[in-house]
Swiss-Prot record:
One of its GO terms (cellular component) is host cell endosome. GO terms for molecular function: DNA binding; structural molecule activity. Belongs to the papillomaviridae L2 protein family. It holds the Pfam family Late_protein_L2. GO terms for biological process: microtubule-dependent intracellular transport of viral material towards nucleus; symbiont entry into host cell; viral penetration into host nucleus. Minor protein of the capsid that localizes along the inner surface of the virion, within the central cavities beneath the L1 pentamers. Plays a role in capsid stabilization through interaction with the major capsid protein L1. Once the virion enters the host cell, L2 escorts the genomic DNA into the nucleus by promoting escape from the endosomal compartments and traffic through the host Golgi network. A motif (Nuclear localization signal) lies at residues 1-12, 451-459. The keyword Disulfide bond applies. Highly phosphorylated. The gene is L2. Keywords: Capsid protein, Cytoplasmic inwards viral transport, Disulfide bond, DNA-binding, Host endosome, Host Golgi apparatus, Host nucleus, Host-virus interaction, Late protein, Microtubular inwards viral transport, Phosphoprotein, Viral penetration into host nucleus, Virion, Virus entry into host cell. This is Minor capsid protein L2. Disulfide bonds join 21-27.
Length: 470
């Protein structure tokens, strides 16, 4: 991304340059004629005004008075005024003579006018007819309402979401003699509106606790970002970095003792050399932070360095991460208790103890002759880590397990009486005698290893007089 260039500053005006360079005689060639009015244009106007006079036309550069005759205003259309409301004429003025009394009577004259209407006459007889009755029964009106009386009914339904608060009370106390003291409030019906309320239940260590406050969660720790690419990593070995870091940036004031656990701001003079070269041009040192990284406890502070100033007044503030390792964190090895492995030196099988593990099958041919009655079967030809087991038997054909304590499944093994000859063991494994031709040609090459020459394609471009090959 291209950086924005600062706007180019305009040089001083001709008047400012004339005031500074006139005395020293170092003015540019175009400054003195422009200020003193001796340019070619000024001379042409001066010479031309000697023979031609345009003063009466009002085209000069003076004040806009319009010349001798002045400006003539342009004509405007006449406007017609609308008639206003009629004016009430003034009433008759009563003059007061010197002989008139000065007290004005507040009693107004009567304004009743007699129009000569006839006076109504009141008849002497006639009027309303009054009916009398001789019944002495009092007149009683039935004011009982004929509407149906209001009946209030209460119904209850089981809601699995809402739990009645009365069911959440702790268990009642029980006395030593076994009596149970229970006190419950009676539920009375009311005509007011019942609004169901939600109860937030959070089960704690004991049963029956209700609360509407959610479980507080620890706030998430903000990420410091001390090891990003934007920060310069600077290790510090001076112990004063922990107690009084300001002594590494500026010279201490014995009267003032600041708090090193807050953000420190410094005012850098024009010529300043920090006591520690690593803290040169640092004008702000933020609060410390203890972190653990790579097995050590690290004391960190982030500082702002004032390095460059642009023409527009912008100051570049690169950030620096100062850190000091306090102590390593010892690695505790994980100890796992292991059981010792005990190997048995000699393992023998007794027919009486392990008679239910294996079966002995007698051969009728050998039983009649009685030969091999005192033969001993030895299973020692297996070259494995299993222990050698010797089992005496009076018969030749016997199926026995390899070992009594073996975790493997017993495999039936048939033993025959030995004839005294050593079995033939080949010196090397016997493989099938199949001729193998290593340098043969009866194979197929994978298509991915086949090189196919790419030919250049020719596209004809049709023009007015033929085509041109690509």
């Amino acid at each position: 991304m291209a950086k924005a260039r600062a706007p180019r500053r305009k040089r001083a005006s001709a008047t400012q340059l004339y005031q500074t360079c006139k005395a020293s005689g170092t003015c540019p060639s175009d400054v003195i004629p422009k200020v003193e009015g001796t340019t070619i244009a000024d001379q042409i106007l001066r010479w031309g005004s000697m023979g031609v006079f345009f003063g009466g036309l009002g085209i000069g550069t003076g004040s806009g008075t319009g010349g001798r005759t002045g400006y003539i205003p342009l004509g405007r259309p006449s406007t017609t005024l609308e008639p206003g409301p009629p004016v009430r004429p003034a009433g008759a003025v009563e003059t007061v003579a010197p002989s008139d009394p000065s007290i004005v009577s507040l009693v107004e004259e009567s304004s009743v006018v007699d129009v000569g209407a006839p006076t109504p006459t009141i008849p002497s007889q006639g009027g309303f007819e009054i009916a009398t009755s001789s019944d002495a029964t009092p007149a009683i009106l039935d004011v009982t309402s004929t509407t149906t009386p209001i009946r209030v009914s209460i119904t209850s339904h089981d809601n699995p979401i809402y739990t009645e608060p009365s069911l959440l009370d702790p268990p009642p106390p029980v006395q030593m003699d076994g009596r149970v003291l229970v006190s419950t409030s009676t539920l009375q019906s009311s005509t007011a509106e019942n609004i169901p309320m939600d109860t937030f239940i959070i089960m704690q260590d004991h049963i029956g606790t209700t609360t509407s406050t959610p479980i507080p969660r620890p706030p998430a720790r903000p990420r410091l970002g001390l090891y990003s690419r934007a920060l310069q990593q600077v290790p510090v070995q001076d112990p004063a970095f922990l107690q009084q870091p300001s002594s590494l940036i500026t010279y201490d004031n014995p009267v003032y003792e600041g708090n090193p656990d807050v953000t420190l701001h410094f005012e850098q003079p024009t010529i300043h050399n920090a006591p520690d070269p690593a803290f040169m041009d640092i004008f702000a040192l933020h609060r410390p932070a203890l972190t653990t990284r790579r097995g050590v406890v690290r004391y960190s502070r982030v500082g702002d360095r004032a390095t460059l100033h642009t023409r527009s007044g912008l100051q570049l503030k690169p950030r620096v991460h100062f850190f000091q390792d306090l102590s390593p964190i010892a690695h505790v090895p994980e100890e796992i208790e292991l059981h010792p492995l005990i190997s048995a030196n000699n393992t023998s099988i007794n027919n009486g103890l392990y008679s239910d593990i294996y079966d002995v099958y007698a051969d009728t041919d050998f039983a009649d002759t009685g030969g091999f009655s005192s033969s001993t079967v030895s299973h020692s030809s297996v070259q494995t880590a299993l222990q050698t087991t010797s089992i005496p038997s009076q018969y030749g054909n016997t199926t026995v397990p390899l070992t009594a304590s073996s975790p493997y499944t017993p495999i039936p093994t048939s033993f025959r009486p030995s004839s005294g000859h050593t079995p033939f063991v080949p010196a090397r494994p016997i493989f099938p005698q199949t001729p193998i031709a290593v340098n043969g040609g009866d194979f197929y090459l994978h298509p991915s290893y086949t090189y196919v020459r790419k030919r250049r394609k020719r596209f004809p471009y049709f023009l007015a007089d033929g085509y041109v090959a690509a």
